[in-house]
């Protein structure tokens, strides 16, 4: 059979969307307003049956990398459905097989300008595989208070096998802090907003996907069609380190990030804009 590149890019000219800096230089966007007006994250988690206390084993960042620079014990949210949600700063979670309908807004501290913000609280595996601080002497001042960990004021998230019917967006970090403000998309993660998307209609659950999209106000779909990902200043990793071509992250539309790393089996149809 004909081989296929693990990462592909392509879009027809009529699909290209014109972007301006005004769309992402302020945090008071249409996307954030939608998330602010929605049911709180904690309430939506409770509605989905609640968090049962499950966490990952110390998980490497980047995920699957032998050269990890930090580790996280992530709370795991599995098989949950969120509708227009703001993910609070400090969540640092793994979302597994979750659905995000509408806007998913990631909250973080925008004024992360301290030179050591990336490193304060960073951990590594020490003797016996026990987590230990990588830089135990480092602290950071936040609003006049000294802290030994910046993870509660940041957001490092992994979405595995999730479905986004809308836009993934977030506060804009004023400095590129990829150890702390990072989004990783792994597994069969999907983004759709067009109810007539040919790729979506080929999915086994196409009827459900299309029904949810058609249930949205058309004006909302048009707004979210401007960008499937609005994460200026963020580090975004798309795809998997392994070579398993049965798992593929599919992105479409305009993707706005601080820096995006596409690896493994990823399929991107649209425009990439890094800030």
Predicted regions mapped to residue ranges:
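Core solenoid repeat modules with strong leucine/isoleucine-rich periodicity
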Residues: 2-10, 15-21
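Long, polar low-complexity repeats
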Residues: 26-33, 37-275
């Amino acid at each position: 059979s004909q081989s296929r590149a693990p990462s592909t890019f392509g879009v027809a000219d009529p699909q290209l969307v014109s972007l301006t800096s005004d769309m992402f230089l302020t945090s008071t966007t249409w996307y954030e307003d939608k998330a602010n007006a929605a049911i709180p994250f904690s309430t939506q988690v409770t509605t989905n049956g609640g968090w049962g206390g499950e966490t990952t084993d110390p998980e490497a960042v980047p995920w699957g990398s032998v050269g990890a620079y930090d580790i996280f014990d992530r709370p795991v949210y599995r098989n949950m459905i969120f509708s227009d949600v703001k993910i609070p700063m400090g969540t640092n979670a793994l979302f597994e097989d979750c659905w995000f309908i509408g806007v998913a807004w990631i909250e973080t501290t925008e004024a992360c300008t301290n030179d050591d913000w990336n490193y304060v609280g960073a951990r590594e595996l020490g003797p016996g595989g026990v987590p230990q601080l990588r830089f135990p002497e480092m602290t950071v001042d936040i609003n006049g208070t000294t802290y030994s960990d910046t993870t509660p004021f940041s957001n490092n998230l992994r979405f595995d096998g999730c479905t986004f019917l809308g836009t993934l967006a977030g506060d804009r970090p004023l400095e590129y802090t990829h150890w702390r403000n990072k989004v990783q998309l792994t597994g069969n993660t999907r983004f759709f907003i067009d109810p007539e998307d040919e790729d979506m209609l080929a999915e086994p659950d196409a009827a459900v996907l299309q029904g949810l999209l058609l249930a949205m106000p058309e004006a909302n779909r048009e707004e979210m069609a401007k960008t499937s990902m609005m994460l200026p200043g963020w580090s975004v990793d798309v795809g998997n380190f392994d070579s398993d071509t049965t798992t593929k992250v599919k992105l479409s539309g305009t993707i706005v990030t601080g820096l995006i790393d596409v690896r493994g089996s990823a399929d991107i149809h649209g425009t990439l804009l890094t800030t």
